Amino acid sequence: MPFSSYIGNSRRSSTGGGTGGWGQSLLPTALSKSKLAINRKPRKRTLVVNFIFANFFVIALTVSLLFFLLTLFHFGVPGPISSRFLTSRSNRIVKPRKNINRRPLNDSNSGAVVDITTKDLYDRIEFLDTDGGPWKQGWRVTYKDDEWEKEKLKIFVVPHSHNDPGWKLTVEEYYQRQSRHILDTIVETLSKDSRRKFIWEEMSYLERWWRDASPNKQEALTKLVKDGQLEIVGGGWVMNDEANSHYFAIIEQIAEGNMWLNDTIGVIPKNSWAIDPFGYSSTMAYLLRRMGFENMLIQRTHYELKKDLAQHKNLEYIWRQSWDAMETTDIFVHMMPFYSYDIPHTCGPEPAICCQFDFARMRGFKYELCPWGKHPVETTLENVQERALKLLDQYRKKSTLYRTNTLLIPLGDDFRYISIDEAEAQFRNYQMLFDHINSNPSLNAEAKFGTLEDYFRTVREEADRVNYSRPGEVGSGQVVGFPSLSGDFFTYADRQQDYWSGYYVSRPFFKAVDRVLEHTLRGAEIMMSFLLGYCHRIQCEKFPTSFTYKLTAARRNLALFQHHDGVTGTAKDYVVQDYGTRMHTSLQDLQIFMSKAIEVLLGIRHEKEKSDQSPSFFEAEQMRSKYDARPVHKPIAAREGNSHTVILFNPSEQTREEVVTVVVNRAEISVLDSNWTCVPSQISPEVQHDDTKLFTGRHRLYWKASIPALGLRTYFIANGNVECEKATPSKLKYASEFDPFPCPPPYSCSKLDNDVTEIRNEHQTLVFDVKNGSLRKIVHRNGSETVVGEEIGMYSSPESGAYLFKPDGEAQPIVQPDGHVVTSEGLLVQEVFSYPKTKWEKSPLSQKTRLYTGGNTLQDQVVEIEYHVELLGNDFDDRELIVRYKTDVDNKKVFYSDLNGFQMSRRETYDKIPLQGNYYPMPSLAFIQGSNGQRFSVHSRQSLGVASLKEGWLEIMLDRRLVRDDGRGLGQGVMDNRAMTVVFHLLAESNISQADPASNTNPRNPSLLSHLIGAHLNYPINTFIAKKPQDISVRVPQYGSFAPLAKPLPCDLHIVNFKVPRPSKYSQQLEEDKPRFALILNRRAWDSAYCHKGRQVNCTSMANEPVNFSDMFKDLAASKVKPTSLNLLQEDMEILGYDDQELPRDSSQPREGRVSISPMEIRAYKLELRPHK
């Protein structure tokens, strides 16, 4: 998205520049080969280095002779050496890794050793926003005239065009109006001159263009890529958001784009380009590293952090995961130094001058003129010297912010290079300027067009030759000469006190749909894998074949929404509708597929007809009528003498013992399992968000189900002559202004007479304030208490917008006494429903708080809260709704929030930055922890924003309704709110050891119990019900169950995905003898101080021993197991940075199929599955 230019006057400061040690040109041509220093180089002490160099030849000769004699003695004459690691990057130089001492795997105190942490930066920086002059957020940059005498400045100008897949237009509108013309222009203009270069990022547009392009255009683009003129950077389906996106979806969107690119053009990206996400997550750095990426470029980080890093020449660094004590996750990063990625803010520190070199702003083009008053002019023989020197001055000033004498200059903006004339204006003028600079040796500079690969390769080569390391710097063995850094870059501020924390919550309805599509897609992928694994080819290969294009469409619709104006909620209203419609269509398609797949997996349907064209016997129990409608439970009409079949699918790796629910129209019903054995059950009245009619007249039916890991289980809902007790009705109590209270039959109702009420199970008791329905505290089984202090509040925010959160003061409580409170106590579920009274006629929120009493289930450990939110109507304009838990945990205003559902990040509330700057993304989990080890966690199944503004507080924003645009290009507010439900799981835990959150700055992990609770919330059981009832007297068919795993996986091992990557090429791969399945695993790191609870809940094993693929599946034989990258394209583990001790043994060894995974790691494997003979 474009930015208006940021103009200002300010004061001066400066830094010196570095010099190198060689002068001749080392700028690579398009035909240059990569010299890639991927692995670690041992760091030596100076004396040792000097000794080695002085005696190098003697040492080398002696070592070589000894090695030769040892080899000859042990093995005889060696044969040819072959490598099992085959890769397209044959020119890579792999260097041996240094030895690093391992630390305890689940020690919460272990962490990375680095030079810089983002916490250190926040502690040090004063956030004064001082005026820096022409570079408003920096200082007046100067340099010495002789800085480049020993080594010339090498300048790479990188043309690019940022193409948002949806923002102010839909993705298809952008393609038709702009992106297809841009790609046509790139192909034509680059083909004219081999000196011209370009980079492209978004595969969603390239794939769309490819479908329309003629064979000649396709061939021309492929040639440009192969010749190095056009580089595909990132290569994901989109340039994803990094705050709200879950790591599952990030992996999916990058893999979808990378695999299409590799299949179509035959290249695999290795440089990431992320100029527009609004803040950066360290999870992204990890995922890219494990996909084989070597370098990253980022732009939108806090302007004060940029300034500090620039002052210390640390804008290029090695990003290391905070938990990585062994330095296996290192990736090289280039951070752009200025306000924006447009041309005025990329050539140097003075935008008024840089804008004069954006030749698309010359009169006659459609772009706005430079706002500083001086405009670009055509370069001629008469003005080339003056223009070149002015441009080179900016290049030199920018280069002083970095350590090396290799300089990157992006040249582009949103949807640029749309016409031949525009592209020619840029290429023509810049080439003339380059020619002048390059033909004058006295300037000590060489400039040319380049790609990211050209730049990063040259930087690495220079760093190999010139020692830029500083005394005492930890750095990295991967690329020497640069500092190491850990942490993330949230929350982003681009100027003054404008913090981009609003988009963590904008359009929360669609953030929730995003997660539903994720877990539904994952479930469908798992079912597809078992279908193709178990089925004989002739019998049922036809079944999934015609669905494969819908599966691909679902992957791509999920990927599209990960765009940094999609899941962020920062697009125009009708563009949001387009995203929502695409996701809704895919949800429907996936549910239909799953409903048919269960028939095959349970052996219900085996007709020879093409079964994917015939109607299914089942349908999803929850359905959405349209893209912006809440899911509605389809009620089961259990008439006398009938039974309804219910099929439950468990997407978890462990057996699920869980209380499940469906909605029924009648109360006189019973539940039976697949053997027609009676199952105890409970009914409760269904309540709704309506203070004039609290009860719908329908009932929630609960029973405890047991479903095998990744499996299916059948239950029956019966009404009639069965030898089972009817579902037990819950008992209701109320505090309400209704007189008389509308007690629904067949329930008994009594009045709440006290100021407090309680619900309880064997683990905890919840205490509520009857006057306002809020949760006061949790009383634990041992008598200890956790104060919760639940409070609903609102910010008044007239300056907030889709991106920015700018509140006018603190949030004020909105709940008043004397609302409706109804408690429901039953056999399996205890619930408190609260419809609070507020100053508005219709409350914007109601809630249900539940405890489960299933017995030995994960649910028993949590407090489940459903917030029904309706921030609808003008009464709520410029309001932002929050829930605040005012606990008694002495957290010192330190809290932890997750990054992309993958890892936790330590957060600290700073008084020196405004309230909005202390809000952070919460994709799925936040917790606070006290000095006595008491921990209070909130799990969410959608991304939101979280803060801890005062001692013991944990505050989460639920929704926001904003009238005004916040000046970041969208041109509107956020007024399209939808009714929605936000679900939290609260968990209060006691530690067996004490830890001060303020003094301990290392990363914290969730407990094992917390991990499992989060997984159950985000990967719920999928429920399907029969479309037609059956006669209760006919007890057939007995569908039974489907249990594909030989045994549940270890509790700390999570299946991220189990899929057939190329379902449309499934048969072809069989003929090519390639593994057709992919299994992605994550081993969870957990806080061992809390292990005692987690092991009590159906947790029989941990992944301390290697995982054995050969005995993982019950009736399937796994073979051809090969480790691969997370984008499923690389098979060289050294490229991916994995620790040597994790690498699998050669396939010729008897331990084939056994793999070890370290905590925190995500590993991907290709494998083949066939039924046992």
Swiss-Prot record:
Residues 1-21 are annotated as: Disordered. Its main location: Golgi. InterPro entries: Gal_mutarotase_sf_dom, Glyco_hydro/deAcase_b/a-brl, Glyco_hydro_38_C, Glyco_hydro_38_cen, Glyco_hydro_38_cen_sf, Glyco_hydro_38_N, Glyco_hydro_38_N_sf, Glyco_hydro_57/38_cen_sf. Binds 1 zinc ion per subunit. Not sensitive to EDTA and not significantly stimulated by cations such as Ca(2+), Co(2+), Mn(2+), Ni(2+) or Zn(2+). It comes from the Eukaryota. Residues 72-1173 are lumenal. It is found in: Golgi apparatus membrane. The keyword Disulfide bond applies. Keywords: Disulfide bond, Glycoprotein, Glycosidase, Golgi apparatus, Hydrolase, Membrane, Metal-binding, Signal-anchor, Transmembrane, Transmembrane helix, Zinc. Pfam families: Alpha-mann_mid (PF09261), Glyco_hydro_38C (PF07748), Glyco_hydro_38N (PF01074). GO terms for molecular function: alpha-mannosidase activity; carbohydrate binding; mannosyl-oligosaccharide 1,3-1,6-alpha-mannosidase activity; metal ion binding. Disruption phenotype: Predominant presence of unprocessed hybrid N-glycans. Reduced levels of glycoprotein N-glycans. Increased sensitivity to salt stress. Glycosylated. One of its GO terms (cellular component) is Golgi cis cisterna. Catalyzes the first committed step in the biosynthesis of complex N-glycans. It controls conversion of high mannose to complex N-glycans; the final hydrolytic step in the N-glycan maturation pathway. Converts GlcNAcMan(5)GlcNAc(2) (Man5Gn) into GlcNAcMan(3)GlcNAc(2) (MGn) by sequential removal of two alpha1,6- and alpha1,3-linked mannose residues from the alpha1,6-mannose branch of the substrate. To a lesser extent, also able to cleave beta1,2-xylosylated Man5Gn-glycopeptide (Man5GnX-GP) and pyridylaminated substrates Man5Gn-PA and Man5GnX-PA, but not active toward Man5-glycopeptide. Homodimer; disulfide-linked. Interacts with GALT1. This is Alpha-mannosidase 2. It comes from Arabidopsis thaliana.
